[in-house]
Swiss-Prot record:
Organism encoding this protein: Mus musculus
Record-given protein name: Large ribosomal subunit protein uL3-like
Alphabetical keyword list: Ribonucleoprotein, Ribosomal protein
Induction: Expression in skeletal muscle is down-regulated in response to a hypertrophic stimulus.
Job description of the protein: Heart- and skeletal muscle-specific component of the ribosome, which regulates muscle function. Component of the large ribosomal subunit in striated muscle cells: replaces the RPL3 paralog in the ribosome in these cells. The ribosome is a large ribonucleoprotein complex responsible for the synthesis of proteins in the cell. Inhibits myotube growth and muscle function.
Feature: compositional bias, Basic residues: 1-31
One term under GO cellular component: cytosolic large ribosomal subunit
One BP term from GO: translation
Length: 407
């Protein structure tokens, strides 16, 4: 029998086995940043929704470069991040076997989009979730018990995490169920953390209070699902020669005769995509503010820069494909991230302490592209397109009734 006379490394990484569909749709934080009591109390993560991608132009200002102020065009991802609502707090005590939940306190009022998450069919349900938990805030005995619970939390707990949910009504989705998550509080003492929660219960927390410009963060998400794929697409194994019997996109040898079973490290066909992944060190290029009123006028210039002063929004012409318009606060991250459009994304503060020039570099954008992402767009704004193309038929039809009325 013939065989190849050279060796080659195996195809595919075994560190992410098993390659099967994720059990959860929202990215789960399995490790939190180390707590530093000297810092003020702050959240360590946030939730957003992937809108799409565009590109930017900026000057690189890293000290030590051979070419100073070199211009670079870079791809960026837009993640829409409406404010989160704080609806509860969980205290954890330290045990020899790790952390254990000690007390859980929910807010007095929970919105329907939050309570929908606890029902499979909200329309047919009796909608009684959290009715007993809410009554504690109204009678005298319940208020006394709540004060005791908060005091016990300050005395015994080592870790404080808040329960937050997203606001689906602010997003261009049909989905009404909010995504709920526990986020750890870092900084300050335990008493200060509990006081932080009490002051912000049932209130909104914006993204700019969690992250800062040019910060390096981690992105946790479930990747885009690809369905059932063959071994060549799933593991990138080499295709067999043209005249191979019964197919080319296969693995010729799947192991020895004995042991009489197929090993776990052998590349096989199966599920590809929809895997839970954590990607480290994503740099924030911009934390943009959503559309808002200022002096009686709507402000939409969250895509303007000091070099490009055009009054334009981050939403490209025609909207982001398969998403729509971004009208809320957003985060612009360098490069691509896991997940498809509208996928919920977990943004976490970095676990590492960064010292590199690239991580500490301050980002100043010169230009943000807002051309249409559906086709080959060449106009940055609708006004620019109309000035170049001239009046369209729909504009002329609007002007006709006005001229007839004046006559």
């Amino acid at each position: 029998m013939s065989h190849r006379k050279f060796s080659a490394p195996r195809h595919g990484h075994l560190g992410f086995l098993p390659h099967k569909r994720s059990r959860r749709h929202r990215g789960k934080v399995k490790s939190w940043p180390r707590d530093d009591p000297s810092q003020p109390v702050h959240l360590t993560a946030f939730l957003g929704y992937k809108a799409g991608m565009t590109h930017t132009l900026r000057e690189v200002h890293r000290p030590g470069l051979k070419i100073s102020k070199r211009e670079e065009v870079e791809a960026v991802t837009i993640v829409e991040t409406p404010p989160l609502v704080v609806v509860g707090v969980v205290g954890y005590v330290a045990t020899p076997r790790g952390l254990r939940s000690f007390k859980t306190i929910f807010a007095e009022h929970l919105s329907d989009e939050c309570r929908r998450r606890f029902y499979k069919d909200w329309h047919k349900s009796k909608k009684k979730a959290f009715t007993k938990a809410c009554k504690r805030w109204r009678d005298a005995d319940g208020k006394k018990q709540l004060q005791k619970d908060f005091a016990a939390m300050k005395k015994y707990c080592k870790v404080i995490r808040v329960i937050v949910h997203t606001q689906m009504k602010l997003l261009p989705f049909r989905q009404k169920k909010a995504h709920i998550m526990e986020i750890q509080l870092n900084g300050g003492t335990v008493a200060e953390k509990v006081a932080w929660v009490q002051a912000r219960m049932e209130k909104q927390v914006p993204v700019h209070s969690v992250f800062s410009q040019s910060e390096v963060i981690d992105v946790i998400a479930v990747t885009k699902g690809r369905g059932v794929k063959g071994v060549t697409s799933r593991w990138h194994t080499k295709k067999l020669p043209r005249k191979t019997h019964k197919g080319l996109r296969k693995v010729a040898c799947i192991g020895a005769w004995h042991p009489a079973r197929v090993g776990c490290s052998i590349a096989r066909a199966g599920q590809k995509g929809y895997h839970h992944r954590t990607e480290l060190n994503k740099k924030i290029y911009r934390i943009g503010r959503g559309l808002h009123m200022e002096d009686g006028k709507m402000v939409r210039n969250n895509a303007s820069t000091s070099y490009d002063v055009t009054d334009k929004s981050i939403t490209p012409l025609g909207g982001f494909p398969h998403y729509g318009e971004v009208n809320n606060d957003f985060i612009m991250l360098k490069g691509c991230i896991a997940g498809t459009k509208k996928r919920v994304i977990t943004l976490r503060k970095s676990l590492l302490v960064h010292h590199s020039r690239r991580a500490l570099e301050n980002i100043e954008l010169k230009f943000i592209d807002t051309t249409s992402k559906f086709g080959h767009g060449c106009f940055q704004t609708a006004q620019e397109k109309r000035a170049f193309m001239g009046p369209q038929k729909k504009h002329l039809e609007k002007e006709k009734p006005e001229t007839l009325g004046n006559m």
